[in-house]
């Protein structure tokens, strides 16, 4: 969190402790302290393809959805719902999911599971609600049916007479059961759906008519009872009245640290009523706007930005203790793993006070338990070549134990993820460290279609600087099998950089999710002299699209123009690594076992 600075009119002491050279640095150091915590983590082998988890307050059990090796080319033949003891992390039961015909016409005659991605518990009716992004379905099962053979739906939204893209609920993600109002809320592409938990009547709500929305996560405000949903496509947060099913407020989430990168990719949302704040995890682009946006709960204005991680995903908050837990998925499409950590953040100070190294990569979901501990699901696949019996042969649809998943002759080793539980104890307050970081003032420009460009406002001859921007698409391309209501992918444009009208660089923009952007380097000519001003222009060079451009003016100096910001951070401390509980094996699919006695040993 940025620290307060000394007034420019304050009288400065002759000397400053700790080697600080200015009144601002001395004042910042005096104000720097942080909440000290002791972090413990426990871990056990989990399931292949873990997605989300839900806690039952009635049975005190955790239910985990698992669907492995699901791709656009084929459905999954390794999937289950597991019941887990949240104290020991042992898997007590695994379900036999319903087997259906492959929904892809080119794989007619083959089979897949009706899978489970999103999940929540309805203790009032003794049911489990799950979403299936592979078949665009929401399905309800009985909790006590996990160990009674193949699961049979109590109800499903899936209509076999309709194609995938004609299903009523589009690409469902999270499910939240509001027992007080007897409704289940499901997020997905195009809005959210409200389903009566007794009659299963479905109502669609479009929070942003005229544009395609994609709410993903759902969190309940413990004070008002309203729901908060984060929109991944539109970078907005919706506050929803669960009684009237209406959006009572829409809050835009602005850029956190790179202002000309207006796209932040909203993911998780949590609130703290006592602090009057909303916390939004944002994935950003290549480290830009990657972290947690802190919004004023009353006005919706950005108060603070906490930088963290490579690709932050899910988060939960322990409001009683004002502790935020934030997972880092890491880079999704790189050979080298990244992410795999969970940050412990003091919400009062906006400071990361601890970090758990959960897995090699891919933290996907967090669940807060009543005792304040947090269960973490990763998708790293760190347990290699496991054998499971919740697997079917894609050609026959028959259950068969296997450590390999086969589709169209291609074999994929079945790797399992981990279940991790984090517990945090307060240990008082300690002096922190004042960290200084450079803030480089930027010159920014915008083209006629809203594409942006930004670079340092002051440059030095011979210096290499970064130029970046958002937008710059050369049209769109649409998949022929997708309905027109689905978003088209933008085509990255060919771009050129001009310095005072002369072309100095040509390159192609990049594609990420539904957007296009660019990051490139520019070497400042040695012929430029301090005191001069020069114009840098980025323009499209794609022959098939109308020309457009954006320009900025930069000033040349002998030295870079940098501002220094001070922030209080926790003292450097090593990551917490989980202790490992011996794996007791998977119970037979459709069956169960009693809790085994296990010992906990250090990893």
Residue ranges and their predicted role:
Residues 3-448, 462, 466, 496, ...:
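Predominantly soluble domains enriched in secretory-pathway, periplasmic, or organellar proteins
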